């Protein structure tokens, strides 16, 4: 299994401005790829200088940019998220701003190639306002975004989240109902799937549509974004389920911001080694 099969999301550093050392640290811990968390206060995807720096840093570190996570807010300031960008908002101004920001993020591909755009459909239920999670508004947004992404050569991956629009069943239904869309897929976020129930059930439900993954753990009641094996998820079962539905990566570690982040990266590298061992064992079992 290649190093590029395992990525780290820069969500790990999202409270800081992205810099070269963040990518150096990811590469130094044996990861071959990165997912950029698009947030203007972290990585300003609208700034040509920031984009140029990213291209240089990726070249320096030999990291592959496998995916970009579309913005869900405009900024994080002193620990406070500002500028809601819900694609499912009934507020037309918010929704149109969100669509415009996603399209601006997709324009990155003209300078730095990536295959997948991870997208939130609405807002997690525990923090959502009454206007944030409307199915009709979400569909109108996606009717614009999915074709725009396809024209850029990028596939949209709708992320499993803890709201009614983003359960595995809901996302499968949304994609199947949108017969006029270019191919879209699902980002199976294992931590979120655990909060909804059994991740194995989620993986089986999304079978055939999984094009991306977020791997992180949870103790079962909060979206903790822990290093795998630090929470309640049975990873051997989950990884075998992924293999049974034909998903082979990338496995993107989307981990909570921590200080120092390098400690989290070291523990993530150990978890990656356990993944590699588990996937190898599962390969042997499935070939018998």
What are the roles of these predicted feature ranges?
Residues 91, 126-137, 168-181, 262-279:
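Short, electropositive alpha-helical surface patch
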Residues 66-71, 119, 207-219, 253:
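Non-cysteine beta-strand/loop elements that form the S-adenosyl-L-methionine
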Residues 105-129, 157:
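Active-site groove signature of glycoside hydrolases
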Residues 1-104, 110, 150, 197, ...:
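N-terminal pre-domain/capping segments
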Residues 26, 34, 58, 98, ...:
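Conserved, mostly hydrophobic/aromatic
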Residues 19-20, 51, 95-102, 138, ...:
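Aromatic/hydrophobic pocket-lining residues that form the small-molecule binding cavity
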Residues 4-5, 33-34, 133, 139-232:
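Acidic/histidine-rich catalytic cores of soluble enzymes
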Residues 11-19, 37-51, 124-129, 161-168, ...:
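Acidic-and-aromatic substrate-binding clefts and catalytic sites of carbohydrate-active enzymes
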């Amino acid at each position: 299994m290649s190093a590029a099969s395992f990525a780290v999301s820069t969500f790990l550093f999202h409270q800081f401005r992205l810099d070269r050392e963040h990518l150096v640290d990811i590469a130094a811990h044996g990861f071959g790829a990165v997912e950029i968390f698009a947030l203007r206060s972290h990585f300003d995807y609208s700034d040509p200088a920031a984009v140029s720096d990213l291209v240089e840093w990726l070249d320096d570190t030999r990291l592959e940019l496998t995916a970009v996570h579309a913005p869900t807010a405009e900024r994080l300031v002193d620990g406070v998220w500002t500028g809601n960008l819900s694609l499912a908002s009934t507020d037309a101004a918010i929704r149109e701003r969100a669509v415009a920001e996603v399209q601006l993020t997709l324009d990155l591909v003209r300078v730095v190639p990536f295959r997948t755009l991870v997208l939130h459909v609405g807002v997690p239920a525990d923090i959502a306002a009454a206007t944030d999670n409307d199915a009709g508004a979400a569909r109108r947004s996606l009717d614009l975004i999915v074709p725009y992404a396809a024209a850029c050569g990028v596939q949209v991956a709708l992320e499993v989240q803890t709201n009614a629009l983003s359960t595995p069943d809901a996302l499968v239904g949304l994609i199947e109902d949108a017969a006029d869309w270019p191919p879209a897929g699902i980002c199976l976020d294992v931590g979120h799937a655990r909060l909804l129930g059994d991740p194995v059930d989620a993986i089986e439900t999304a079978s055939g549509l999984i094009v991306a993954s977020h791997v992180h753990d949870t103790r079962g009641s909060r979206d903790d974004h822990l290093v795998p094996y630090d929470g309640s998820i049975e990873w051997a079962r989950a990884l075998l389920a992924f293999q049974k539905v034909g998903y082979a990566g990338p496995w993107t570690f989307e981990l909570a911001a921590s200080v120092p982040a390098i400690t989290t990266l070291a523990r993530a590298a150990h978890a990656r080694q356990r993944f590699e061992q588990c996937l190898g064992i599962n390969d042997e079992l499935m070939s018998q």
